[in-house]
A protein has these predicted regions:
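Conserved, structured core segments of small domains
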Residues: 1-132
């Protein structure tokens, strides 16, 4: 192993020994295979699948990714999922109607959440919600 790389197992262990959060998630980067038309044709089924992942606690977060500079959207997105392992995350990604139909291509990468903060504000009566 070169000095510039570490095994993923090493990174997981290092998170534990350094008292980091060490939460392993999987990021699905998804991007158009052939323009926007196939994406729009599959958007309803895709969103239903996303809702199912959310309802079952598989989805951590998801949403579209703006193009560089944030001026436009060309159909790219990111989905962060909870999965037992890489193979399970791949299976979740492959089942997305966007990917199964060929409207989008994707790749999955493991992500180790070590640092950061999150603030959640929920208004019970108003039904408002805020994430910061």
């Amino acid at each position: 192993m070169s000095e510039d790389t570490r095994t993923w197992a090493h990174m997981l262990e290092r998170a534990k020994t350094n008292n980091f959060l060490g939460k392993q998630l999987f990021v699905v980067f998804t991007y158009p295979a052939d323009g926007m038309e196939p994406i729009m044709e599959n958007i309803t089924e895709h969103l239903a699948y996303q809702r199912m992942l959310e309802d079952t606690g598989v989805m951590f977060a998801a949403g579209p990714m703006g193009d560089r500079g944030g001026e436009t959207w060309s159909g790219s997105g990111m989905v962060v999922v909870r999965a037992e392992n890489f193979a399970a995350a791949e299976k979740i990604a492959a089942a997305d109607p966007m990917h199964a139909s060929g409207a989008r291509n994707y790749h999955v990468q493991p992500w180790l959440v070590n640092e950061g903060t999150i603030t959640v504000k929920v208004g019970f009566a108003s039904g408002s919600r805020e994430l910061d």
